């Protein structure tokens, strides 16, 4: 708990400096604590430290972890990993936001499942693939217009904006063009939310207009358990 409090204070200082450079306000940034592969105790400690938004990559992992958390007041859980179609029905009651919608088919299934569960509209973001990495998921920019128009009318989804994961660079400045490109696409399609920036490059993301940053290592330290 003490380490998370200290790390969060350092992160907040870095956020404040990036916001000052870009003449923005703290209220414009949602800090998502990425708790994938960490135990439920880490999520609870982060919540006690004042964090309210949490990111998970794997539906099955969070399905196991969720009952251990109990009711956390004001907590919001974001799915930030690839969502397979066969996991939609499990994901829908677990998450408040799915940031990795990359096809109209997936969006349709989410909307249908949300309706069937009798839940209010699900917040979603569209994941955009801006690199050539085969390991990355997302909609290609040239197909984004069709996806946006396919998702907007769905009655049980609420389209917030765009999300991307650039290649990892030691130099965070190399991520900046990817962030700038996502911002341009958001402006083009009149979308307000931009989920971009992780522990290594979130300051550059904030300077380029991020509204949601996803931080794991900066808050919790390096993971010792392999992802998967």
Regions found by a protein language model. Give the residues of each.
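Conserved alpha/beta-domain cores
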Residues: 1-200, 206-208, 220-223
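Gly/Pro- and small hydrophobic-enriched strand-loop and loop-to-helix capping segments
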Residues: 210-228
């Amino acid at each position: 708990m003490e380490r998370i409090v200290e790390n969060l204070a350092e992160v907040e200082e870095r956020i404040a400096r990036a916001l000052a450079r870009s003449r923005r306000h703290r209220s414009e940034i949602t800090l998502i604590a990425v708790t994938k592969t960490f135990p439920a105790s880490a999520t609870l400690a982060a919540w006690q430290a004042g964090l309210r938004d949490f990111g998970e990559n794997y539906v099955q992992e969070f399905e196991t972890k969720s009952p251990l958390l109990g009711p956390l007041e004001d907590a919001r859980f974001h799915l930030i990993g690839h969502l397979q179609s066969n996991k939609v029905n499990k994901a829908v009651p677990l998450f408040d936001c799915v940031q990795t919608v990359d096809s109209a088919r997936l969006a349709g299934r989410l909307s249908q499942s949300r309706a069937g569960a009798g839940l209010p509209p699900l917040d979603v973001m569209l994941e955009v693939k801006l690199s050539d990495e085969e390991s990355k998921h997302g909609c290609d920019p040239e197909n984004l217009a069709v996806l946006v128009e396919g998702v907007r009318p769905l009655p049980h989804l609420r389209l917030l904006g765009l999300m991307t994961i650039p290649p990892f660079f030691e130099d965070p400045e190399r991520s900046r063009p990817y962030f700038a490109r996502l911002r341009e696409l958001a402006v083009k399609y009149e979308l307000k939310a931009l989920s971009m920036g992780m522990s290594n490059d979130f300051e550059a993301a904030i300077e380029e207009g991020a509204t949601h940053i996803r931080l794991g290592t900066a808050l919790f330290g390096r993971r010792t358990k392999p992802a998967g």
